Amino acid sequence: MKNILKKLMLMLICCCICGFCMAQNDLNRVDKNGKKQGPWKKFEKGVLVYEGQFENDVPKGTFKYYYPNGKVKSVSEFVTGVSRVNVTTYHENGNVASKGTFINQQKDGQWKYYSDKNVLLSEENYKLGKKNGLFVTYSVEGYKLKEEVYANDQLNGESKTYYEKEELLTVSHYINGKLNGELITYYPGNIPSQKGLYYNGLKTGVWEINDPKGQIRRTEEYDKNGNIQKKYLFLYINGSPQKLNQNLIAYFQKKGETKTVAILKNGNKIESTENLNTIVQWLDLLEFVRVTPNLYAEMSCVRGYKNIDAQSVRVILRPALEYDVIAEGNEAALIRSLFATGEPKE
């Protein structure tokens, strides 16, 4: 009886060894034509990189790729050879990183991307490698940040961006990758900050700029070539707006703590019931310069200066004001910088 058991054990061991040898021989096999056949495993420095099946050199079924620590990095399901492949990638903690399909090695259909905490970060849609359909981006907290629509790899239709917690930031419209139609930007609280029209990527018509309270502060008028033609400022007098052509304004002068006087180039004056700091926020500071803490001048009205000492200058203004205007410190340096050739003749 013992001899019989020994013979059976010996036969079992032999079978196991033969089976192992056959399995080893079946791994990473190349046929006489040099084509990969059957199960394959690739190792680098003793670490498994991927494993899968080949049939006539073409991947078939499930392929798995691995991180150096042995965890699954991605799984590819070869549905019809390499012409259609469903792919899922993973973070090292095991959570899904992305999911989607390749058709002829190009992204197709919906793709989704996730954080390592399993939060959806983006949704994308493709047609044979080209962006086609809705694209949505999310914050790591899961809030929507951006929505865009593509057709044939170009932006088309309505696009939106958001502040945190999905408050609207911008709404714009595209045709074939160019801005066309209305664009609106918002302050937090869904208050419009500016709005206007685009045509073929260029601003056109009247654009409105508002303050955080929703009050209109400035308008800009553009021609069909996107060139600005007119700018208007809105001064508030006891809560009511008064529209002024910016080209007619020479100076803004502080009057007490709560008022500002706009002095026009023809000498007329308009008194606003808002302080200078509030009005200055809406000036085009490429066209106005701070002469003193209490006075802003339109650039063309600053005709020159006379040095008083290293830290101060007397500013020459046209139309002239009723008093000498002395710029000091940073304001004096700024006035000097307007005249690169040095002190001009009065």
Where does each model-flagged region fall?
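Bacterial Sec-dependent N-terminal signal peptides
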Residues: M1-L27
